[in-house]
Amino acid sequence: KKIKDFFFIFKNINRINQKKPKYLFYSENKSYLKFGYLIIEYLAKKFPGEVYYISSDVDDKINNLDVINVHISSGFLLQYFFTSVSVENLFMTLTDLNNSIIKKNKFVKNYIYYFHGAVSTTKIYTSAAFDNYDTILCNGDYQINEIQHREKIENLKKKKLIK
């Protein structure tokens, strides 16, 4: 059964890459769904069939016919997913993109971070936690100011910051 599941997930990842969806959300587990749900619902209504919800948690799904749910597990399959995924906009709540095991790839046009807490970007995250994102959905001016300050002092590429 494990071998069968592995190949089923592998096949699903390759299907996503062939489709090259407009919007893809990655979730580590179902506890993160509440933070992106409204964005997902809005995009699914506006772009039916173009929104994918990918999770490492088999129980993490969105009950919306316009959202395509895919379980990808973790470990090797998660690594394979992130190195091969081809999508226009990839939404995540994972920090430290490109600084940890999750690396950017050339097939993603726009890496988008959305917060799962209304906290300062300088208090609980690593200093480079958001450096490699293209777009960040911020909770307020304080996050925008903190990110812009870091971009300036570290001479980083400017991100699109949305409040």
Region annotations inferred by a language model:
Residues L24-K163:
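Active-site and donor-binding regions of nucleotide-sugar-utilizing enzymes
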Residues K1-N29:
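Membrane-proximal basic amphipathic "stem/tether" segments
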